Amino acid sequence: MPRYAQLVMGPAGSGKSTYCSTMVQHCEALNRSVQVVNLDPAAEHFNYPVMADIRELIEVDDVMEDDSLRFGPNGGLVFCMEYFANNFDWLENCLGHVEDDYILFDCPGQIELYTHLPVMKQLVQQLEQWEFRVCGVFLVDSQFMVESFKFISGILAALSAMISLEIPQVNIMTKMDLLSKKAKKEIEKFLDPDMYSLLEDSTGDLRSQKFKKLTKPVCGLVDDYSMVRFLPYDQSDEESMNIVLQHIDFAIQYGEDLEFKEPKEHEEESSSMFDEYFQERQNE
């Protein structure tokens, strides 16, 4: 039987560890067994039990304190991840060979691990050799994404990971529970956006002609091919968490031997997929 994995990615502070913690609790409520593996050698603490912790293999602080290496924080992290890639047997021993595993990998936030280095791609390939079906879960902070240009920046980061890893990817806006009512209403247009409309709304802020020329084809690429879209993740709302989990399960065909339902928004194409969610939040 296949095994299943989520690679939980995103910038520092986007809520990766919180996502892992709340998703584990949500799955436990559904009587589903989910484990977490910490792959951030610079992590200080997290609010969930782990089945494996990369810090047992190597830690950033130890690398930075090594006088023969003399790495800073970023260099130390890269060294740790490259060392990890050369010691996948450690991870294999930690994971064991249990069928039907479902594991969340809490990954580091540095974008260069996905754009410039082969480490995460090598991890994906190794997991696939171990018969894992892997889905990327890319997180961005919804509070950061309420402005058009920041949203485009978040899209480029998500797109970089998607292209580099070549696996199904679900993109999520986290910390929806921290937004004001006004911000929640504003952010709905960013979940399944019309990129050309967003560009038109913000052209007055584009002072550089070169920047305008760059932004327009980027928006066109995303819009024409429907390459990036986002789901809202509100850890205080079970329905929001369930929608996210349904999309991920659908991407990796979790429980394909069971009767499976497609994510809810496919059932009613004529209406916005999150109209009900936002209406409930605005009425609170």
From Swiss-Prot:
GO terms for molecular function: GTP binding; GTPase activity. GTP binds at residues 13-18, 174-177. InterPro entries: Gpn, Gpn3, P-loop_NTPase. Residues 261-284 are annotated as: Disordered. CDD domains: GPN3. The keyword rRNA-binding does not apply. Keywords: GTP-binding, Hydrolase, Nucleotide-binding. It comes from the Eukaryota. The record marks 74 as: Stabilizes the phosphate intermediate. Pfam families: ATP_bind_1 (PF03029). A motif (Gly-Pro-Asn (GPN)-loop) lies at residues 72-74. The keyword Nucleotide-binding applies. Heterodimer with GPN1. Binds to RNA polymerase II (RNAPII). Interacts directly with subunits RPB4 and RPB7 and the CTD of RPB1. Small GTPase required for proper localization of RNA polymerase II (RNAPII). May act at an RNAP assembly step prior to nuclear import. Belongs to the GPN-loop GTPase family. This is GPN-loop GTPase 3. The lineage of its organism: Eukaryota, Metazoa, Chordata, Craniata, Vertebrata. The gene is Gpn3.
